[in-house]
């Protein structure tokens, strides 16, 4: 008799995706982040669902409802801080996942890569709208500043901003619709994750060498499930340490002040995971130019497969490209630091130089490094 795992229509899908899936034997811990992102998404949906049971999306009660969750709901503070810091974990895993894709040439699976970019945009949109919901000072002013960027679009800009706001400023209508979108988007993301996995399983996983590994495959379970569980335990430990010991480490103190349209905070800045893009936005003096640079800083990932000039897929054996990659990582960390600093000398010029370097590395230096390596290897 055939094992029910392999014959039943439902378990067959699970079996071919997570149990008997042929996986390269050489994949390292850098391949753990996909499963960690899945866990992050599940944690965010669960904690978010329970938070939504107590939260009220109304300008007069939103801030107090969050306070009520933290003070009066049983373990409400755990839910709230797991959700807030879970978002930070989500983005740490996301950036490491994208970085691994860049380093090992996983972007040559173009469908998987492009769905991944759409997922990145969707997660960023969800996180931005979630940050508005507690209705603190940074929530209100962050929403005002970021939505106002759309007014830079010629001709339709102002009408578009007022349409998104549902009025002439960020108010009750804005908060209500942001809550609705923040609630529905994670489920859309879940569906997109299925598509991401569907495309991935069409080609199979890449591996550190970048060489096809069809000759050397092992089943996903138990070998990689055990490895993923180790990664999960490490991530959950980090998350719980953050939640239990310093839950506000990554937050902004201004968000503990209720939103006040008459009082602007001295430094308006988004959460840490958007600071690199925010620094690129601020480094261009023109509003429309800044908005375009902001969008392109993420959208540039879509043209990376076209910029792949190397004869090798992975950077494992390409030292010049490795230098360029780590220079890009250092540049992104610099941009993240600059995004959190006030707009004054010397931060302005550092931000502008780092922004130019960011686009230069991806568009010019990396393809040139690959061509140089091809030439050195007489290819």
Swiss-Prot record:
<keyword id="KW-0496">Mitochondrion</keyword>
<keyword id="KW-0813">Transport</keyword>
<dbReference type="GO" id="GO:0006122">
    <property type="term" value="P:mitochondrial electron transport, ubiquinol to cytochrome c"/>
</dbReference>
<dbReference type="InterPro" id="IPR005798">
    <property type="entry name" value="Cyt_b/b6_C"/>
</dbReference>
<keyword id="KW-1133">Transmembrane helix</keyword>
<keyword id="KW-0249">Electron transport</keyword>
<comment type="similarity">
    <text>Belongs to the cytochrome b family.</text>
</comment>
<dbReference type="GO" id="GO:0008121">
    <property type="term" value="F:ubiquinol-cytochrome-c reductase activity"/>
</dbReference>
<dbReference type="GO" id="GO:0005743">
    <property type="term" value="C:mitochondrial inner membrane"/>
</dbReference>
<feature type="transmembrane region" description="Helical">
    <location>
        <begin position="347"/>
        <end position="367"/>
    </location>
</feature>
<dbReference type="GO" id="GO:0046872">
    <property type="term" value="F:metal ion binding"/>
</dbReference>
<feature type="binding site" description="axial binding residue">
    <location>
        <position position="83"/>
    </location>
    <ligand>
        <name>heme b b562</name>
    </ligand>
</feature>
<keyword id="KW-0408">Iron</keyword>
<keyword id="KW-0472">Membrane</keyword>
<feature type="binding site" description="axial binding residue">
    <location>
        <position position="182"/>
    </location>
    <ligand>
        <name>heme b b562</name>
    </ligand>
</feature>
<feature type="binding site" description="axial binding residue">
    <location>
        <position position="196"/>
    </location>
    <ligand>
        <name>heme b b566</name>
    </ligand>
</feature>
<keyword id="KW-0999">Mitochondrion inner membrane</keyword>
<protein>
    <recommendedName>
        <fullName>Cytochrome b</fullName>
    </recommendedName>
</protein>
<dbReference type="Pfam" id="PF00032">
    <property type="entry name" value="Cytochrom_B_C"/>
</dbReference>
<dbReference type="InterPro" id="IPR030689">
    <property type="entry name" value="Cytochrome_b"/>
</dbReference>
<feature type="binding site" description="axial binding residue">
    <location>
        <position position="97"/>
    </location>
    <ligand>
        <name>heme b b566</name>
    </ligand>
</feature>
<feature type="transmembrane region" description="Helical">
    <location>
        <begin position="226"/>
        <end position="246"/>
    </location>
</feature>
<dbReference type="InterPro" id="IPR048260">
    <property type="entry name" value="Cytochrome_b_C_euk/bac"/>
</dbReference>
<comment type="subunit">
    <text>The cytochrome bc1 complex contains 11 subunits: 3 respiratory subunits (MT-CYB, CYC1 and UQCRFS1), 2 core proteins (UQCRC1 and UQCRC2) and 6 low-molecular weight proteins (UQCRH/QCR6, UQCRB/QCR7, UQCRQ/QCR8, UQCR10/QCR9, UQCR11/QCR10 and a cleavage product of UQCRFS1). This cytochrome bc1 complex then forms a dimer.</text>
</comment>
<dbReference type="InterPro" id="IPR036150">
    <property type="entry name" value="Cyt_b/b6_C_sf"/>
</dbReference>
<comment type="function">
    <text>Component of the ubiquinol-cytochrome c reductase complex (complex III or cytochrome b-c1 complex) that is part of the mitochondrial respiratory chain. The b-c1 complex mediates electron transfer from ubiquinol to cytochrome c. Contributes to the generation of a proton gradient across the mitochondrial membrane that is then used for ATP synthesis.</text>
</comment>
<feature type="transmembrane region" description="Helical">
    <location>
        <begin position="288"/>
        <end position="308"/>
    </location>
</feature>
<dbReference type="Pfam" id="PF00033">
    <property type="entry name" value="Cytochrome_B"/>
</dbReference>
<feature type="binding site">
    <location>
        <position position="201"/>
    </location>
    <ligand>
        <name>a ubiquinone</name>
    </ligand>
</feature>
<dbReference type="InterPro" id="IPR005797">
    <property type="entry name" value="Cyt_b/b6_N"/>
</dbReference>
<keyword id="KW-0812">Transmembrane</keyword>
<keyword id="KW-0830">Ubiquinone</keyword>
<feature type="transmembrane region" description="Helical">
    <location>
        <begin position="178"/>
        <end position="198"/>
    </location>
</feature>
<keyword id="KW-0479">Metal-binding</keyword>
<feature type="transmembrane region" description="Helical">
    <location>
        <begin position="33"/>
        <end position="53"/>
    </location>
</feature>
<dbReference type="InterPro" id="IPR048259">
    <property type="entry name" value="Cytochrome_b_N_euk/bac"/>
</dbReference>
<keyword id="KW-0679">Respiratory chain</keyword>
<feature type="transmembrane region" description="Helical">
    <location>
        <begin position="113"/>
        <end position="133"/>
    </location>
</feature>
<feature type="transmembrane region" description="Helical">
    <location>
        <begin position="77"/>
        <end position="98"/>
    </location>
</feature>
<dbReference type="GO" id="GO:0045275">
    <property type="term" value="C:respiratory chain complex III"/>
</dbReference>
<dbReference type="InterPro" id="IPR016174">
    <property type="entry name" value="Di-haem_cyt_TM"/>
</dbReference>
<feature type="transmembrane region" description="Helical">
    <location>
        <begin position="320"/>
        <end position="340"/>
    </location>
</feature>
């Amino acid at each position: 008799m055939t094992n029910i795992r392999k014959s039943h229509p439902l378990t067959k899908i699970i079996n071919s995706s997570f149990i008997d899936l042929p996986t390269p034997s050489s994949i390292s811990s850098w391949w753990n982040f996909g499963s960690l992102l899945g866990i992050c998404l599940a944690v965010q949906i669960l904690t978010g669902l329970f938070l939504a049971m107590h939260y009220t999306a109304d300008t007069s009660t939103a801030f107090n409802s969050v306070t009520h969750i933290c003070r009066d709901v049983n373990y409400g503070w755990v839910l709230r801080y797991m959700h807030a810091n879970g978002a930070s974990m989500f983005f740490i895993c996301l950036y490491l996942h994208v970085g691994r894709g860049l380093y090992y040439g996983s972007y040559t699976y173009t469908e998987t890569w492009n769905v991944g970019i759409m997922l990145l945009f969707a997660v960023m949109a969800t996180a931005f709208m979630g940050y508005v919901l507690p209705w603190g000072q940074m929530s209100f002013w962050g929403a005002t500043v970021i939505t106002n960027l759309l007014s830079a679009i010629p001709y339709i800009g102002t009408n578009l901003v007022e349409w998104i706001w549902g009025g002439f400023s960020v108010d009750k209508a804005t908060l209500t619709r942001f809550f609705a979108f923040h609630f529905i988007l994670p489920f859309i993301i879940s569906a997109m994750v299925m598509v991401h996995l569907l495309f991935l399983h069409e080609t199979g996983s890449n591996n550190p060498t970048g060489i096809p590994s069809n000759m050397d495959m092992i089943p996903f379970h138990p070998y990689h499930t055990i490895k993923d569980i180790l990664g999960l335990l490490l991530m959950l430990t980090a998350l719980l340490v953050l939640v239990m010991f310093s839950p506000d480490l990554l937050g902004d103190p201004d968000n503990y002040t209720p939103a006040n349209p008459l009082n602007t905070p001295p430094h308006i800045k988004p959460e840490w995971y958007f600071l690199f893009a925010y620094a690129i936005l601020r480094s261009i003096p023109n509003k429309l130019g800044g908005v375009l640079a902001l969008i392109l800083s993420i959208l540039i990932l879509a043209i990376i497969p076209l910029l792949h000039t190397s004869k090798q897929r992975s950077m494992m054996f390409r030292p010049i490209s490795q230098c360029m990659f780590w220079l890009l990582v250092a540049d992104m960390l610099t941009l993240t630091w600059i995004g959190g600093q006030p707009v004054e000398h010397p931060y302005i010029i550092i931000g502008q130089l780092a922004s130019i370097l960011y686009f230069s590395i991806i568009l010019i230096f990396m393809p040139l490094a690959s061509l140089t390596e091809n030439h050195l290897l007489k290819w």
